[in-house]
From Swiss-Prot:
A Pfam family this chain is assigned to: CSD
Subcellular location as annotated: Cytoplasm
Entry keyword set: Activator, Cytoplasm, DNA-binding, Stress response, Transcription, Transcription regulation
SUPFAM superfamilies attached to this UniProt entry: Nucleic acid-binding proteins (SSF50249)
Assigned GO CC terms: cytoplasm
Lineage: Bacteria, Bacillati, Bacillota, Bacilli, Bacillales
Protein name per its UniProtKB record: Cold shock-like protein CspLA
Native source species: Listeria monocytogenes serovar 1/2a (strain ATCC BAA-679 / EGD-e)
Stored PROSITE patterns: CSD_1, CSD_2
Length: 66
């Protein structure tokens, strides 16, 4: 798993971006967030995640709040 920081996340649209430790950004969809209840992330929040190849390039999977 990688570690990163939430760059931004739009809860209304259900997606955002995580900044990886290497400085690259990776797309995150709310469906990739682990846990119960409303799935959202806060700007600046530390997270761990896997990276999978999506239809439009790399995207975060198995996102967990650190």
């Amino acid at each position: 798993m990688e570690q990163g920081t939430v760059k931004w996340f739009n809860a209304e649209k259900g997606f955002g971006f995580i900044e990886r430790e290497n400085g690259d950004d990776v797309f995150v969809h709310f469906s990739a967030i682990q846990g119960d209840g409303f799935k959202s992330l806060d700007e600046g929040q530390a997270v761990t995640f896997d990276v999978e190849e999506g239809q439009r390039g790399p995207q975060a999977a198995n996102v967990q709040k650190a």
